[in-house]
Protein backbone atom coordinates (compact mmCIF):
# COMPACT_ATOMS: atom_id res chain seq x y z
CA UNK A 1 0.00 0.00 0.00
CA UNK A 2 1.33 3.44 -0.96
CA UNK A 3 1.91 6.11 1.69
CA UNK A 4 -0.59 8.48 0.03
CA UNK A 5 -3.50 7.21 -2.05
CA UNK A 6 -5.75 9.74 -3.76
CA UNK A 7 -8.70 8.03 -5.40
CA UNK A 8 -11.18 9.58 -7.83
CA UNK A 9 -11.32 13.05 -6.24
CA UNK A 10 -14.02 15.24 -7.77
CA UNK A 11 -14.82 18.87 -7.02
CA UNK A 12 -17.27 21.30 -8.58
CA UNK A 13 -18.06 24.94 -7.90
CA UNK A 14 -21.68 25.58 -8.79
CA UNK A 15 -22.01 24.13 -12.31
CA UNK A 16 -18.28 24.11 -13.06
CA UNK A 17 -16.44 20.81 -12.73
CA UNK A 18 -12.89 21.60 -11.63
CA UNK A 19 -11.63 18.14 -10.65
CA UNK A 20 -13.04 15.22 -12.63
CA UNK A 21 -11.81 12.10 -10.88
CA UNK A 22 -8.17 12.64 -9.92
CA UNK A 23 -6.26 9.57 -8.70
CA UNK A 24 -2.60 8.98 -7.89
CA UNK A 25 -0.35 7.26 -5.36
CA UNK A 26 2.97 8.27 -3.85
CA UNK A 27 5.44 6.78 -1.38
CA UNK A 28 6.86 8.37 1.75
CA UNK A 29 9.82 10.62 0.91
CA UNK A 30 8.84 11.15 -2.72
CA UNK A 31 8.46 14.55 -4.35
CA UNK A 32 5.73 15.07 -6.93
CA UNK A 33 5.47 18.23 -9.03
CA UNK A 34 2.15 19.15 -10.61
CA UNK A 35 2.40 21.19 -13.80
CA UNK A 36 -0.05 22.45 -16.39
CA UNK A 37 -1.73 25.59 -17.62
CA UNK A 38 -3.62 27.85 -15.23
CA UNK A 39 -7.24 26.94 -14.57
CA UNK A 40 -6.84 23.17 -14.87
CA UNK A 41 -7.39 22.23 -11.21
CA UNK A 42 -3.86 22.13 -9.78
CA UNK A 43 -4.48 24.50 -6.87
CA UNK A 44 -7.95 23.07 -6.22
CA UNK A 45 -6.39 19.61 -5.87
CA UNK A 46 -3.95 20.89 -3.24
CA UNK A 47 -6.75 22.66 -1.40
CA UNK A 48 -8.80 19.46 -1.37
CA UNK A 49 -5.85 17.50 0.04
CA UNK A 50 -5.54 20.10 2.82
CA UNK A 51 -9.33 20.23 3.35
CA UNK A 52 -9.38 23.93 2.58
CA UNK A 53 -11.96 22.72 0.07
CA UNK A 54 -14.00 19.58 0.76
CA UNK A 55 -14.07 17.13 -2.17
CA UNK A 56 -17.48 16.20 -3.54
CA UNK A 57 -16.47 12.56 -3.88
CA UNK A 58 -13.49 10.25 -3.74
CA UNK A 59 -11.16 9.20 -0.94
CA UNK A 60 -7.79 10.13 0.55
CA UNK A 61 -5.72 7.56 2.44
CA UNK A 62 -2.48 8.35 4.29
CA UNK A 63 -0.28 5.59 5.70
CA UNK A 64 -3.15 3.11 5.60
CA UNK A 65 -5.67 5.42 7.32
CA UNK A 66 -8.61 6.76 5.34
CA UNK A 67 -8.74 10.44 6.25
CA UNK A 68 -11.45 11.34 3.76
CA UNK A 69 -14.21 8.84 3.02
CA UNK A 70 -16.80 10.43 0.79
CA UNK A 71 -19.89 9.88 2.90
CA UNK A 72 -22.31 12.77 3.37
CA UNK A 73 -21.73 12.98 7.12
CA UNK A 74 -17.94 12.85 6.97
CA UNK A 75 -17.70 15.35 4.13
CA UNK A 76 -19.13 17.90 6.56
CA UNK A 77 -17.09 16.83 9.60
CA UNK A 78 -13.43 16.60 8.66
CA UNK A 79 -11.53 16.30 11.94
CA UNK A 80 -9.15 19.28 12.37
CA UNK A 81 -6.41 16.85 13.38
CA UNK A 82 -6.55 15.34 9.89
CA UNK A 83 -5.59 18.69 8.42
CA UNK A 84 -2.26 18.36 10.21
CA UNK A 85 -1.43 15.44 7.92
CA UNK A 86 -0.75 18.05 5.23
CA UNK A 87 1.12 21.34 5.49
CA UNK A 88 0.40 24.11 3.00
CA UNK A 89 2.66 26.87 1.69
CA UNK A 90 0.65 29.45 -0.24
CA UNK A 91 1.86 31.50 -3.19
CA UNK A 92 1.07 34.80 -1.42
CA UNK A 93 2.71 33.89 1.92
CA UNK A 94 -0.42 34.59 4.08
CA UNK A 95 1.61 35.83 7.05
CA UNK A 96 0.01 37.86 9.84
CA UNK A 97 1.33 41.40 9.24
CA UNK A 98 0.98 42.39 12.92
CA UNK A 99 3.29 39.60 14.13
CA UNK A 100 7.04 39.08 13.85
CA UNK A 101 8.47 36.20 11.84
CA UNK A 102 9.03 34.33 15.10
CA UNK A 103 5.45 34.77 16.28
CA UNK A 104 4.06 33.82 12.87
CA UNK A 105 5.80 30.45 13.21
CA UNK A 106 5.08 30.02 16.93
CA UNK A 107 1.39 30.87 16.74
CA UNK A 108 0.18 27.69 15.02
CA UNK A 109 2.04 25.53 17.55
CA UNK A 110 0.54 27.52 20.43
CA UNK A 111 -2.97 27.01 19.05
CA UNK A 112 -2.28 23.30 18.68
CA UNK A 113 -0.96 23.08 22.26
CA UNK A 114 -4.02 24.92 23.59
CA UNK A 115 -6.40 22.62 21.72
CA UNK A 116 -4.61 19.53 23.01
CA UNK A 117 -4.89 20.75 26.62
CA UNK A 118 -8.59 21.49 26.15
CA UNK A 119 -9.13 18.04 24.65
CA UNK A 120 -7.48 16.54 27.73
CA UNK A 121 -9.96 18.40 29.95
CA UNK A 122 -7.31 20.57 31.65
CA UNK A 123 -9.00 23.36 33.63
CA UNK A 124 -8.40 27.03 32.86
CA UNK A 125 -5.82 27.91 35.54
CA UNK A 126 -3.86 24.70 35.05
CA UNK A 127 -4.07 25.15 31.29
CA UNK A 128 -2.74 28.69 31.60
CA UNK A 129 0.31 27.46 33.52
CA UNK A 130 0.87 24.60 31.09
CA UNK A 131 0.66 26.98 28.14
CA UNK A 132 3.55 29.06 29.48
CA UNK A 133 5.75 25.99 29.36
CA UNK A 134 4.37 24.92 25.99
CA UNK A 135 4.91 28.39 24.52
CA UNK A 136 8.55 28.41 25.60
CA UNK A 137 9.12 25.05 23.87
CA UNK A 138 7.20 26.17 20.79
CA UNK A 139 9.26 29.34 20.53
CA UNK A 140 12.50 27.36 20.66
CA UNK A 141 11.20 25.11 17.89
CA UNK A 142 10.25 28.17 15.83
CA UNK A 143 13.75 29.62 16.25
CA UNK A 144 15.29 26.35 15.09
CA UNK A 145 13.04 26.28 12.02
CA UNK A 146 13.76 29.89 11.09
CA UNK A 147 17.46 29.16 11.42
CA UNK A 148 17.07 26.16 9.10
CA UNK A 149 15.59 28.37 6.39
CA UNK A 150 18.35 30.96 6.80
CA UNK A 151 16.44 33.61 8.77
CA UNK A 152 18.23 33.51 12.12
CA UNK A 153 18.86 37.27 11.83
CA UNK A 154 15.27 38.13 10.84
CA UNK A 155 13.27 36.46 13.62
CA UNK A 156 12.03 39.71 15.15
CA UNK A 157 11.27 41.45 11.86
CA UNK A 158 7.70 42.02 10.72
CA UNK A 159 6.57 40.86 7.27
CA UNK A 160 6.74 44.41 5.90
CA UNK A 161 10.44 44.43 6.81
CA UNK A 162 11.15 41.25 4.85
CA UNK A 163 11.64 40.62 1.14
CA UNK A 164 9.19 38.38 -0.68
CA UNK A 165 11.68 35.52 -0.60
CA UNK A 166 12.20 35.95 3.13
CA UNK A 167 8.44 36.03 3.74
CA UNK A 168 8.02 32.80 1.79
CA UNK A 169 10.76 31.16 3.85
CA UNK A 170 8.89 32.20 7.02
CA UNK A 171 5.80 30.57 5.52
CA UNK A 172 7.77 27.36 4.90
CA UNK A 173 9.02 27.37 8.50
CA UNK A 174 5.43 27.87 9.70
CA UNK A 175 4.22 24.92 7.63
CA UNK A 176 7.00 22.72 9.04
CA UNK A 177 6.17 23.75 12.62
CA UNK A 178 3.24 21.34 12.89
CA UNK A 179 5.31 18.40 11.57
CA UNK A 180 3.03 17.50 8.65
CA UNK A 181 3.38 14.12 6.97
CA UNK A 182 3.14 15.74 3.54
CA UNK A 183 4.14 19.29 2.63
CA UNK A 184 2.27 21.02 -0.20
CA UNK A 185 3.45 24.08 -2.12
CA UNK A 186 1.09 26.13 -4.28
CA UNK A 187 3.29 27.94 -6.81
CA UNK A 188 5.70 29.07 -4.06
CA UNK A 189 7.70 31.39 -6.34
CA UNK A 190 4.95 32.93 -8.48
CA UNK A 191 4.66 36.07 -6.32
CA UNK A 192 8.43 36.63 -6.20
CA UNK A 193 10.76 38.73 -8.30
CA UNK A 194 13.06 36.51 -10.39
CA UNK A 195 16.13 37.35 -8.29
CA UNK A 196 14.39 36.08 -5.13
CA UNK A 197 13.16 32.80 -6.59
CA UNK A 198 16.43 30.95 -6.07
CA UNK A 199 16.50 31.34 -2.29
CA UNK A 200 13.08 29.71 -1.93
CA UNK A 201 13.85 26.89 -4.37
CA UNK A 202 17.08 26.23 -2.45
CA UNK A 203 15.09 25.65 0.76
CA UNK A 204 12.67 23.30 -1.03
CA UNK A 205 15.58 21.34 -2.48
CA UNK A 206 17.07 21.11 1.02
CA UNK A 207 13.78 19.65 2.30
CA UNK A 208 13.84 17.14 -0.56
CA UNK A 209 17.35 16.10 0.44
CA UNK A 210 16.08 15.57 4.01
CA UNK A 211 13.52 13.07 2.73
CA UNK A 212 10.39 15.20 3.06
CA UNK A 213 7.28 14.01 1.24
CA UNK A 214 6.18 16.95 -0.91
CA UNK A 215 3.65 17.90 -3.57
CA UNK A 216 4.60 21.04 -5.49
CA UNK A 217 2.43 22.98 -7.92
CA UNK A 218 4.90 24.97 -9.98
CA UNK A 219 5.59 26.76 -13.25
CA UNK A 220 9.35 26.37 -12.69
CA UNK A 221 9.89 23.60 -15.23
CA UNK A 222 13.63 23.15 -14.76
CA UNK A 223 13.23 23.03 -11.00
CA UNK A 224 10.43 20.47 -11.29
CA UNK A 225 12.63 18.35 -13.54
CA UNK A 226 15.54 18.42 -11.07
CA UNK A 227 13.73 18.00 -7.75
CA UNK A 228 10.89 15.59 -8.55
CA UNK A 229 10.52 11.83 -8.46
CA UNK A 230 7.33 12.08 -10.52
CA UNK A 231 5.68 14.76 -12.64
CA UNK A 232 1.91 15.08 -12.90
CA UNK A 233 0.61 17.01 -15.91
CA UNK A 234 -2.97 18.19 -15.39
CA UNK A 235 -5.35 19.35 -18.09
CA UNK A 236 -9.11 19.97 -17.96
CA UNK A 237 -9.43 18.78 -14.37
CA UNK A 238 -7.80 15.37 -14.84
CA UNK A 239 -4.32 13.90 -14.75
CA UNK A 240 -3.49 13.85 -18.45
CA UNK A 241 -0.10 12.24 -17.98
CA UNK A 242 2.14 11.14 -15.12
CA UNK A 243 5.67 9.77 -15.07
CA UNK A 244 9.30 10.39 -14.21
CA UNK A 245 10.82 13.75 -15.17
CA UNK A 246 12.65 12.03 -18.03
CA UNK A 247 9.43 10.47 -19.34
CA UNK A 248 7.38 13.66 -19.13
CA UNK A 249 9.95 16.18 -20.31
CA UNK A 250 11.83 14.11 -22.87
CA UNK A 251 9.22 11.68 -24.19
CA UNK A 252 5.68 12.89 -23.45
CA UNK A 253 2.96 10.66 -24.88
CA UNK A 254 -0.07 12.92 -24.66
CA UNK A 255 -0.66 15.51 -27.37
CA UNK A 256 -1.84 17.95 -24.69
CA UNK A 257 1.44 17.52 -22.82
CA UNK A 258 3.44 18.08 -26.00
CA UNK A 259 1.42 21.20 -26.81
CA UNK A 260 1.94 22.55 -23.28
CA UNK A 261 5.72 22.22 -23.55
CA UNK A 262 5.75 23.75 -27.03
CA UNK A 263 3.90 26.82 -25.75
CA UNK A 264 6.15 26.99 -22.67
CA UNK A 265 9.25 26.93 -24.86
CA UNK A 266 7.82 29.63 -27.12
CA UNK A 267 7.14 31.86 -24.10
CA UNK A 268 10.69 31.36 -22.81
CA UNK A 269 12.17 32.27 -26.22
CA UNK A 270 9.90 35.32 -26.48
Regions found by a protein language model. Name each.
Residues 235, 242, 246-270:
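C-terminal boundary and immediately downstream tail of ABC-type ATPase nucleotide-binding domains
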Residues 2-4, 10-245:
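ABC family nucleotide-binding domain
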Amino acid sequence: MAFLEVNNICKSFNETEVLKGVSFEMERGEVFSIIGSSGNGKTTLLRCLNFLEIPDSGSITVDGEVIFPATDDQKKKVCPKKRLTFGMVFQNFNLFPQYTALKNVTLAMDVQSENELKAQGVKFLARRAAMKEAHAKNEETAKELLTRVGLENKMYNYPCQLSGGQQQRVAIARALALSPDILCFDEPTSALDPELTGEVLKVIKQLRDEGRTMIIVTHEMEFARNVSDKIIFMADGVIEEMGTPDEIFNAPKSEKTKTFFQKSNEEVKA
